[in-house]
């Protein structure tokens, strides 16, 4: 069975060294963390780590059990479609001269994206949505303009059924 991408939401105590201990656990087990975001929660003394890792089910289960043994870990939830919300943010820089600029702006408006920077020969676009929406925007833009660069970041967070504080 090939590894699949898994997203873990890990509620931890907001204390120095917790991130290092969690990252070391993944490293010792030979897992590469593909994406990591850490931020404060609504509870002042807690932080939430969102960790994306590729793994098969059995090793992921083992690492989850090991995470639960860490003293500063409060709760771990694997985020899936049913218990989370996901979005992708794309920053796309396109070559757009006076002749193609109106076409680009039309496409941007159609996808409810925003032009966030303008220069004489290029536009920078900010788009958010699911992966399909971002891919569709890129397909619409590519025939008429040259995409100079793009940076895409995907994130997932607990939805209403994925939030709680019990271990």
UniProtKB/Swiss-Prot annotation:
Pathway: Amino-acid biosynthesis; L-isoleucine biosynthesis; L-isoleucine from 2-oxobutanoate: step 1/4; Amino-acid biosynthesis; L-valine biosynthesis; L-valine from pyruvate: step 1/4. Keywords: Amino-acid biosynthesis, Branched-chain amino acid biosynthesis, Transferase. GO terms for cellular component: cytosol. Pfam families: ACT_AHAS_ss, ALS_ss_C. CDD domains: ACT_AHAS. GO terms for molecular function: acetolactate synthase activity; acetolactate synthase regulator activity. Residues 7-81 form the ACT domain. It catalyses: 2 pyruvate + H(+) = (2S)-2-acetolactate + CO2. It is an enzyme of class 2 (transferase). It comes from the Bacteria. InterPro entries: Acetalactate_synth_ssu (IPR004789), Acetolactate_synth/TF_NikR_C (IPR027271), Acetolactate_synth_ssu_C (IPR019455), ACT-like_dom_sf (IPR045865), ACT_dom (IPR002912), AHAS_ACT (IPR039557), AHAS_small-like_ACT (IPR054480). Its EC number is 2.2.1.6. GO terms for biological process: isoleucine biosynthetic process; L-valine biosynthetic process. Dimer of large and small chains. Belongs to the acetolactate synthase small subunit family. This is Acetolactate synthase small subunit.
